[in-house]
């Protein structure tokens, strides 16, 4: 009778160890899942932050940290910004390296070479 109880206890202990070891092996996967879930939650909450500051403004109308910031640009800065935007629109370097080098025939065993 005692032998049967010992065998059952050892079987349950082995089963518990097997379950616990599988849980520990999948722990990095759970960390990755939780990190992705947190990133999605932060990304989803991003547009609502302006609404939060609006609510705070109703409670604390004189708080300087909640006032909208006005940024003054020098007269020539707007023209410079427009020129930079025009340059960035037509810039072929915005493409990934593989697409830029689509016609490249040189191939090195570690990857594509610059042509």
From Swiss-Prot:
- Where does it primarily localize? secreted
Q: Name one GO molecular function term.
A: hormone activity
Lineage, please?
Eukaryota, Metazoa, Chordata, Craniata, Vertebrata
Q: Which GO terms describe its cellular component?
A: extracellular space
Q: Enumerate the UniProt keywords alphabetically.
A: Cleavage on pair of basic residues, Disulfide bond, Hormone, Secreted, Signal
Q: Provide the family line.
A: Belongs to the somatostatin family.
The Gene Ontology biological process annotation of the record reads: regulation of cell migration
State the protein's name: Somatostatin-2
| Protein function | Somatostatin inhibits the release of somatotropin.
What are the residue ranges of the propeptide? 19-87
């Amino acid at each position: 009778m005692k032998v049967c109880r010992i065998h059952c206890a050892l079987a349950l202990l082995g089963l518990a160890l097997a379950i616990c070891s599988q849980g520990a092996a999948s722990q990095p996967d759970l960390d990755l899942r939780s990190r992705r879930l947190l990133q999605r939650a932060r990304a989803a909450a991003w547009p609502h932050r302006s609404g939060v500051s609006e609510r705070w403004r109703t409670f604390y109308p004189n708080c300087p940290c909640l006032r909208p910031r006005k940024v003054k640009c020098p007269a020539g800065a707007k023209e410079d910004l427009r020129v930079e935007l025009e340059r960035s629109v037509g810039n072929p370097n915005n493409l990934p390296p593989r697409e830029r080098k689509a016609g490249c025939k040189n191939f090195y065993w570690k990857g594509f070479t610059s042509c």
